[in-house]
């Protein structure tokens, strides 16, 4: 696996080694888990070359503590990527991505950007879209692989690619879950054993609910030891965000299926 630590190196690799080949791109913030691995395996099966990025983007964190405590396990991530036979790891610094600071930003005006995560985390989608645009311009992939767990993010990136005439196809892959139904997330690494027990209780509640009374469901989730931030039906999906201790988790799933594995 080739590791590119800056944009110049990646451009050199792209120009010299992967001309005329189909490129799949999996953007991550590191702390890789089986959800990321499923995206990478999908990309490997459909492309000649796979690029994975690891960049914890500071501009999409509205909570400084969340940014500071985001899991960092670069050496372990490199081992995982090497075991998957990833072709290129792009691991830029903040200075590479924001050489002059955060002077220009994408400000989404879509309704979906202002509800749920957009309402709960002001500025999050602006920072996310800005860095995704930069990463797509740098890597110039044929295919971009995203997880369904970040459903709002996926919808906004689709609009970004459309509005900026980016010649990249978006492939959305199913959410990977633990047997309890809890979606895999890098933030799960910050959960204690007690937190995990609470999460399992919450997902037992969710699996058994028909989502006809969200107020009652809210009380059940909070009584299980979580602090629900929001739960909402949107079209045929259920969206929710909650805290277990200091760890914030999000999920979405089809109302008919619930959080099934």
Curated annotation (Swiss-Prot):
Q: What is its EC number?
A: 6.3.2.1
* Source species, domain of life: Bacteria
Name this polypeptide is given = Pantothenate synthetase
- Cite a single GO MF annotation: pantoate-beta-alanine ligase activity
List where in the cell it is found: Cytoplasm
**Where (R)-pantoate is bound, by residue?**
60, 153
Q: Which reaction does it catalyse?
A: (R)-pantoate + beta-alanine + ATP = (R)-pantothenate + AMP + diphosphate + H(+)
Positions binding beta-alanine in this chain are 60
- Swiss-Prot/TrEMBL keywords: ATP-binding, Cytoplasm, Ligase, Nucleotide-binding, Pantothenate biosynthesis
Residues engaged in binding ATP: 29-36, 147-150, 184-187
Annotated active site: 36
């Amino acid at each position: 696996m080739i590791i590119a630590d800056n944009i110049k190196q990646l451009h050199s690799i792209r120009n010299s080694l992967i001309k005329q080949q189909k490129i799949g791109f999996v953007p991550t913030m590191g702390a890789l888990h089986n959800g990321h691995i499923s995206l990478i395996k999908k990309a490997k099966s459909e492309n000649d070359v796979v690029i994975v990025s690891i960049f914890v983007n500071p501009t999409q964190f509205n909570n400084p503590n969340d940014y500071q405590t985001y899991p960092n396990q670069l050496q372990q991530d490199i081992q995982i990527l090497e075991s998957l036979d990833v072709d290129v790891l792009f691991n830029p610094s903040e200075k590479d991505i924001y050489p002059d600071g955060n002077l220009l930003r994408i400000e989404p005006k879509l309704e979906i950007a202002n509800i749920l995560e957009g309402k709960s985390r002001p500025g999050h989608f602006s920072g996310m879209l800005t860095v995704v645009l930069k990463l797509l311009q740098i890597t110039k992939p044929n295919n971009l692989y995203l997880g369904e767990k970040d459903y709002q993010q996926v919808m906004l990136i689709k609009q970004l690619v459309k509005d900026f005439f980016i010649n990249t196809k978006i492939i959305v892959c199913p959410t990977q879950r633990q047997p309890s139904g809890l979606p895999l997330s890098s933030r799960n690494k910050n959960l204690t054993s007690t937190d995990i027990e609470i999460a399992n209780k919450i997902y037992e509640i969710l699996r058994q609910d028909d989502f006809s009374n969200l107020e009652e469901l809210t009380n059940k989730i909070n009584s299980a030891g979580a602090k629900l931030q929001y739960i909402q039906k949107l079209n045929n999906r259920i969206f929710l965000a909650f805290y277990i201790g200091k760890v914030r988790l999000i999920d979405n799933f089809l109302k008919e299926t619930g959080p099934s594995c």
